[in-house]
Each structure stands twice: as structure tokens, then as C-alpha cells.
Regions:
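A detector of short terminal or domain-flanking linear segments
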Residues: 1-14, 83-139
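Short, basic amphipathic alpha-helical segments that act as recognition/interaction helices
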Residues: 3, 8-11, 28-32, 40-64
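Short amphipathic alpha-helix starts
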Residues: 15-32
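Short, surface-exposed, charged/polar-biased interaction segments
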Residues: 51-55, 66-71, 121, 132, ...
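Short, positively charged interaction helices/loops
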Residues: 55-88
Length: 139
């Protein structure tokens, strides 16, 4: 299984849409900053604010990731990875902060036989059949 560091997130090219509710005054202030040229658009301001807050709490995130043995970034699980686990008699616990992706050539039967649990703080990409097979194992 491959793990990609947080620094590689820009190369991954994967984003998730997030919907937030803001008060009209906050929204107006954001629009004013955009209009005055501080940010190119609303999304630019919101991304910058989120990154700044994540930087403020960066050390806490790193400690939590280390304590919980989470993969930080991208974890891609391929058929070969799962076949090796099956041959070795291992059940995998997938724990990711970022993106967990199960390859499209992985069957529901193989994931049921090899994946004990999936915990993703971020996004989980897998076929509908694989998601259904893991439904009772997704934390």
C-alpha cells in the first residue's frame, strides 16, 4: 500500500466539495476582501483561512496521527496488496487522514476477506460494490 505525504497533496489533484453556511455579514466581509483584491475569489479566502488554521494546529495533528498510527495523505489499496494480505492471513485496518482509495479491479469478496475496518478522515473512493461490501466495517 502506498502512502503519499501531506506535502504531495497538490500533486494528487483530488478535492472534495464542502458546503458551509455563513452569516450574511461574514459573507459580505468576504466579498469586500475579494472586491478589494486581497483574494481572487471566495474560495481563495476560505482555502487560505482553512490552511492557516490547520497550520496553527499542525503539531496536534502530527501527534494524533502518530498516536493513532494513521496514514497521512493518500493510501491506495490495490488488488495485489489485498492478495498478499490474504495469502499471509492478515486482516487490514485502513486508517487514513486524507484520501483512501481502493482500486477498481478489487472485488467485493476480496475486501470482505482482507479488510477488517476502514476509518477515513477525509475522502474514501471505492466502487459502489466494494463500498457496499464494507458497509458494516466503515467506522
Amino acid at each position: 500500500m502506498a502512502a503519499v505525504s501531506l506535502e504531495a497533496r497538490a500533486r494528487i489533484g483530488e478535492t472534495e466539495k464542502l458546503t458551509i453556511n455563513l452569516g450574511v455579514v461574514d459573507l459580505g466581509q468576504i466579498d469586500l476582501l475579494v472586491q478589494e483584491g486581497f483574494y481572487s475569489n471566495r474560495t481563495d479566502l476560505i482555502r487560505t483561512a482553512i490552511r492557516n488554521q490547520l497550520a496553527v494546529h499542525g503539531e496536534e495533528v502530527r501527534r494524533s496521527v502518530a498516536r493513532r498510527t494513521l496514514v497521512l495523505g493518500l493510501q491506495h489499496v490495490g488488488r495485489a496488496d489485498l492478495e498478499r494480505a490474504l495469502s499471509a492471513g492478515h486482516m487490514l485496518q485502513i486508517q487514513v487522514v486524507g484520501l483512501a482509495r481502493i482500486a477498481s479491479d478489487v472485488s467485493p469478496e476480496l475486501v470482505r476477506a482482507t479488510i477488517q475496518s476502514v476509518e477515513v478522515l477525509g475522502a474514501f473512493h471505492a466502487s459502489t460494490a466494494v463500498r457496499n461490501a464494507l458497509a458494516d466495517r466503515i467506522l
